[in-house]
């Protein structure tokens, strides 16, 4: 815990603390300092553990990607075809829903479609007071 501090230094710190704080406040000061040290150690250990866990996850992820890329290259044609079919099925599920019954914009006659000129004119007329 105290790598660079020997017994004599600890004894000197204790005597100075006793003189400065007095016998009433010294035990509470020692408890609070030890709780701070404990909290800092706990925080440092949790950060270290979290970083190690993230590095392990990242390593596993990269290993999985490498194994997947090498494994897909060595597959038989039948397995490759089935994987392609599964990928196509997954893409079709991910596509947004498209309605086939609604006519496209090019099928609607021009007089039914509002143009930007008519909508601008309508907006300009709506700004004029009625009267």
UniProtKB/Swiss-Prot annotation:
Biased composition (Low complexity): 115-131
Membrane association type: Single-pass membrane protein
Transmembrane regions: 2-22
Cellular compartments annotated: Cell inner membrane
Record bears the keyword Cell inner membrane: yes
Extent of the signal sequence: none
A GO CC annotation given for this chain: TAT protein transport complex
Source organism superkingdom: Bacteria
Positions in coiled-coil regions: none
Keyword terms, alphabetized: Cell inner membrane, Cell membrane, Membrane, Protein transport, Translocation, Transmembrane, Transmembrane helix, Transport
Subunit structure: The Tat system comprises two distinct complexes: a TatABC complex, containing multiple copies of TatA, TatB and TatC subunits, and a separate TatA complex, containing only TatA subunits. Substrates initially bind to the TatABC complex, which probably triggers association of the separate TatA complex to form the active translocon.
Sequence similarity: Belongs to the TatB family.
Name of the molecule in the record: Sec-independent protein translocase protein TatB
Species name: Shewanella halifaxensis (strain HAW-EB4)
């Amino acid at each position: 815990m105290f790598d660079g501090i020997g017994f004599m230094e600890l004894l000197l710190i204790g005597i100075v603390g006793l003189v400065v704080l007095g016998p009433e406040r010294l035990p509470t000061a020692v408890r609070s300092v030890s709780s701070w040290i404990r909290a800092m150690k706990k925080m440092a250990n949790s950060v270290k553990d979290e970083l190690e866990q993230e590095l392990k996850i990242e390593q596993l992820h990269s290993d999985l990607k490498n194994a997947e890329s090498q494994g897909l290259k060595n597959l038989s044609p039948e397995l490759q075809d089935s994987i392609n079919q599964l990928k196509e099925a997954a893409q079709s599920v991910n596509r947004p829903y498209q309605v086939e019954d609604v006519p496209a914009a090019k099928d609607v006659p021009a007089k039914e479609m509002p143009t930007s000129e008519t909508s601008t004119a309508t907006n300009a007329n709506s700004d004029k007071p009625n009267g």
